[in-house]
Amino acid sequence: MSKISLCMIVKNEEDVIERCLNSVKNFVDEIIVVDTGSIDKTKQVVKKFTDKIYDFVWCDDFSKARNYAISKASYEYIMWLDADDVVPEETQKFLIKLKPNLTKDCYMLKYNVAFDNEKPTFSFYRERILKNDNRCKFVGAVHECITPFGEIERLDVAINHKKVKSGDTNRNLRIYNKIKKERTLNAREQYYYSRELFDHKKYKQCVTNLQKLQKMPNVWTENRIESLNILSQCYQILGDKEKSLMYLFQTFKYDTPRANICCKIADYFYTNQMYEQSVYWYKQATFAKDVIDKGGFVEQVYYNYYPYMGLCCSYFYLKDYQKSNYYNEKAGEIKQTKEFLLNKKLLENFMK
């Protein structure tokens, strides 16, 4: 039977590290923890689970720290997690059964990073369990990843990201600015640097850098589509609604229409009181297939609740109260929000 080395990097994670390690202790064979400078009780907690704790002097490079952890691994496969990740019981049971049959080079698991009443609302696949050979290397100082290699299998189980505190919100941008002084960013770095600018509300800088990204070769399709979506959001915020719409339509050059893009196009028409057009685009969102198997980011709300609410409101203004009520009820089947209840009460007056 193949064995698995868990490789982690941590810093000041006393609030979450025990929760994480409790969720993996029954299926991993070795726990390696690299500490990048904790001043709390993280190490004391980790010692309950392993004596393989190593110090690493932080150098503004997540990949170097993670690769150092991998270098200490003894077994055929490595698994990596963040301290605020949790392996659900269902996934634990699945991996215990899988271990005797590990043969692939790379196993991808879903990563749930946002929740509504414990139901995942934002998910995507990450490379999670990998053969421990010279291909198993993280790249990227920030937003680091291992490029999936060899035979790859996607597993229909998930890791949950359960953050309990926010970290240094300026750290990633600071690291990217440091890299930019030393060399030109590659396409992946350019994408994530632009996202950091957006998150810091530097919208004009974000636009400039995303437009630069559009001219770069070797941009991953998912990053290219999302970069156009972010460009659209920037122009929306900057008050240029027509450019915002243009960038949404440009995403269609790279793949079939995504649910979130269809909803945003529908929002444009709804805001402009063009309700037949908004109906069309909200319906397209409900027909869209999720893109998680392509490596895309899936925001579940755009596949059902959000377009159902949009259809409810659009049909209301078209005076088709039967259809308005129908889609409000469909939205209510997903979640009974304040908006659903208000619509229900309002529509009762028009359904008499």
Role assignments for model-derived ranges:
Residues S2, S63-I70, V87-K212, N218:
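Catalytic-site signature of metal-activated, phosphate-bearing donor transferases
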Residues S2-S5, E30:
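Cell-envelope/extracellular polymer assembly enzymes that use nucleotide-activated donors
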Residues C7-F27:
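Short, well-formed alpha-helical segments that are part of the catalytic scaffolds
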Residues D15-E18, D40-F49, E90-T91:
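Acidic helix N-cap motif at the loop->helix transition within catalytic regions
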Residues S23, D35-V45, W58, D82, ...:
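A conserved acidic beta->alpha catalytic loop
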Residues Q44-Y68, K72:
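Conserved donor nucleotide-binding strand/loop of the catalytic core
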Residues I78:
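Short aromatic/hydrophobic "clamp" motif used to bind/position activated sugar donors
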